[in-house]
Each structure stands twice: as structure tokens, then as C-alpha cells.
């Protein structure tokens, strides 16, 4: 992967689900709601001064959210951060930089 360029969209992995799970409470607090389902479906990653993960998450029924999660460099020892998110997404909506 080239530094700065997002990767191609890939199916979510166990690691992707783990990342999404770690920021779930941040999203639920910002949206003031609990999601009955929180299943990572696909993702892109972008290497910057750390890594941005763009994750499509199924949150119930036909509803999806897109998350941008920042993981700092390992030596910084910082928690994952929900940098941004988009609600009202559908299964067919493409993951793009936001």
C-alpha cells in the first residue's frame, strides 16, 4: 500500500471487527442511541502518521454507518479514535474518504 493513498475496499476481518467494537461506544454516545447490531462488513485503510480505517458497519435492518477510525503509531500507545462517521448509509454505498 502506498503511503497516503487509501487501499482498495476489502471484506472485513476479525481485526476490523475488533477496531469497530472499540469505537462503538464513542459512536453510540455521539448519536445518543444504542445499535442492536454492529457488524463490520468491509473496510479500506490509509497509512498516514498512523493508520486511518474506513469501515462500513451494519447496524440493523437495512441501516449502515461508515466510520473513520484513527490508529496512532504503536510507540505512541494511544487508544483508537473515532475521527468521523456518516450515518444513513445503505449496503451498496461505496466507502470513500470523508
UniProtKB/Swiss-Prot annotation:
SUPFAM superfamilies in alphabetical order: Cystatin/monellin (SSF54403)
Gene3D superfamilies the UniProt entry points to: 3.10.450.10
Modified residues (N-acetylmethionine): 1
Recorded GO MF terms: cysteine-type endopeptidase inhibitor activity; endopeptidase inhibitor activity; protease binding; RNA binding
GO terms for biological process, alphabetical: adult locomotory behavior; negative regulation of proteolysis
One Gene Ontology term, aspect cellular component: secretory granule lumen
Locations listed in the record: Cytoplasm; Nucleus
UniProt keyword annotation of DNA damage present: no
Keywords from the UniProt entry: Acetylation, Cytoplasm, Disease variant, Epilepsy, Neurodegeneration, Nucleus, Protease inhibitor, Thiol protease inhibitor
Short sequence motif named Secondary area of contact, residue ranges: 46-50
PROSITE patterns in alphabetical order: CYSTATIN
Main location: cytoplasm
Domain of life: Eukaryota
Swiss-Prot/TrEMBL site (Reactive site) positions: 4
Record InterPro entries: Cystatin_dom (IPR000010), Cystatin_sf (IPR046350), Prot_inh_cystat_CS (IPR018073), Prot_inh_stefin (IPR001713)
Known role: This is an intracellular thiol proteinase inhibitor. Tightly binding reversible inhibitor of cathepsins L, H and B.
Similarity field: Belongs to the cystatin family.
Record's disease association: Epilepsy, progressive myoclonic 1: A form of progressive myoclonic epilepsy, a clinically and genetically heterogeneous group of disorders defined by the combination of action and reflex myoclonus, other types of epileptic seizures, and progressive neurodegeneration and neurocognitive impairment. EPM1 is an autosomal recessive form characterized by severe, stimulus-sensitive myoclonus and tonic-clonic seizures. The onset, occurring between 6 and 13 years of age, is characterized by convulsions. Myoclonus begins 1 to 5 years later.
Binding partners and assembly: Able to form dimers stabilized by noncovalent forces.
Name of this chain's protein: Cystatin-B
Source species: Homo sapiens (Human)
Organismal lineage: Eukaryota, Metazoa, Chordata, Craniata, Vertebrata
GN (gene name): CSTB
Amino acid at each position: 500500500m502506498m503511503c497516503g493513498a487509501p487501499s482498495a475496499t476489502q471484506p472485513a476481518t476479525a481485526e476490523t471487527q475488533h477496531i469497530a467494537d472499540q469505537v462503538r461506544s464513542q459512536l453510540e454516545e455521539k448519536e445518543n442511541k444504542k445499535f442492536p447490531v454492529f457488524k463490520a462488513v468491509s473496510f479500506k485503510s490509509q497509512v498516514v502518521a498512523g493508520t486511518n480505517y474506513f469501515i462500513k458497519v451494519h447496524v440493523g435492518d437495512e441501516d449502515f454507518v461508515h466510520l473513520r477510525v484513527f490508529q496512532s503509531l504503536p510507540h505512541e500507545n494511544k487508544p483508537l479514535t473515532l475521527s468521523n462517521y456518516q450515518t444513513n448509509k445503505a449496503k451498496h454505498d461505496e466507502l470513500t474518504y470523508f
